């Protein structure tokens, strides 16, 4: 836990101190992410885990379905308590941590205020999950994976793998596949209703 926190703090400080002379080419983070996922795939194969075990992992797919259902139920409950339209609560809960998608879709549909809410909501999930994964992984593996939402397939995957070992990686990838396929559909559907 201390290592992760230290890495984040050092990264923020270095980014702030070096912002004037250290510039990364646009899109370079995409190539880093693709390389990272490529090496995860090599590591899975070297440990005897097949592509079928990764993509069609029953536990990961079931977790994705339960996560989606519980997120939508949470959106309805939040809408009730915050006195907002149910479709708006459902839309806010449909981002699953994919802040770059949810903020754009909801800004285009309902304006910058709702887009900002979606951005903060989903970015908060990702930031919190970076710190919560190591805490939950020992005793609550499913919870540790599910708190990541859509980021289980990309930026939080290395932390899931480091905290839980190679055996949880197929579960996280299957879960991440579900939580990356559904947000575009759900966000567009729920945001099509006027508020």
From Swiss-Prot:
Domain of life according to the entry: Bacteria
InterPro entries: LysO
Keyword hit for Transmembrane helix: yes
GO cellular component, one term: plasma membrane
One Pfam family of this chain: Lys_export
Membrane topology: Multi-pass membrane protein
Localisation per UniProt entry: Cell inner membrane
Record key words, sorted: Amino-acid transport, Cell inner membrane, Cell membrane, Membrane, Transmembrane, Transmembrane helix, Transport
Parts of the chain that traverse the membrane: 4-24, 30-50, 61-81, 86-106, 117-137, 170-190
GO molecular function: L-lysine efflux transmembrane transporter activity
Record PANTHER family: LYSINE EXPORTER LYSO
Family classification: Belongs to the LysO family.
Function, as annotated: Mediates export of lysine.
UniProt protein name: Putative lysine exporter
Organism: Haemophilus influenzae (strain ATCC 51907 / DSM 11121 / KW20 / Rd)
């Amino acid at each position: 836990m201390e290592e992760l926190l230290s890495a984040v703090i050092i990264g923020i400080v270095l980014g702030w101190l070096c912002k004037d002379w250290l510039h990364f080419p646009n899109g370079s983070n995409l190539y880093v992410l693709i390389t990272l996922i490529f090496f995860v795939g090599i590591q899975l194969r070297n440990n005897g885990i097949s592509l079928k075990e990764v993509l069609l992992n029953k536990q990961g797919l079931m977790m994705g379905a339960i996560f989606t259902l519980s997120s939508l139920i949470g959106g309805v409950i939040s809408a009730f308590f915050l006195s907002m339209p149910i479709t708006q609560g459902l839309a806010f809960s449909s981002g699953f941590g994919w802040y770059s998608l949810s903020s754009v879709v909801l800004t285009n549909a309902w304006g910058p205020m709702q887009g900002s809410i979606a951005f903060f909501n989903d970015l908060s999930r990702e930031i919190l999950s970076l710190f919560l994964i190591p805490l939950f992984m020992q005793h609550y593996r499913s919870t540790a994976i599910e708190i990541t939402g859509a980021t289980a397939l990309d930026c939080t995957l290395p932390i899931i793998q480091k905290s839980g070992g190679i055996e949880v990686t197929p579960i996280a990838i299957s879960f991440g596949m579900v939580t990356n396929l559904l947000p575009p559909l759900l966000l567009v559907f729920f945001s099509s209703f006027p508020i």
